[in-house]
Amino acid sequence: YDEDSGVRYNKGTNVQFVAAGNTGFAYVSTQRLDSAFEDRFIKVQLDYLTPEEEAALMMQRYPLVKASAAAQLAEIARLLRQAEQKEALTVSLSTRQVLDAAAYLQLGYSVREVVEEVILTNYVIAGEQLVARSLVQMV
């Protein structure tokens, strides 16, 4: 229903609406949704891609990235995310950040250079970069 025009629109058969919202404490200037509004949605928790899926996505998006480099970067992402889940780190690593890092691989940077200059710079709280660096060295 459009309040301004007074026109009611009916949705077509088999039409569904999907919404995404970054409403948690980790997002700047976000607020909790009104409970009545939030109740209108079914919540779905999405997991990160598996390392194999994430490596495949990197190679699909950036065809010049070698499979071994994509696999290494995906494993590093898995370790850093796992550390965030265990509260050893306060910041996770998004798929977007991993893809951004993979773009540098395609430009000829090594995995180590990308990790040092792109990934580890996400960890700015005292001591977190050391924790992240120690995890990355395991790969």
Regions found by a protein language model. Give the residues of each.
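C-terminal regulatory/interaction module of P-loop NTP-utilizing enzymes
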Residues: 1-139
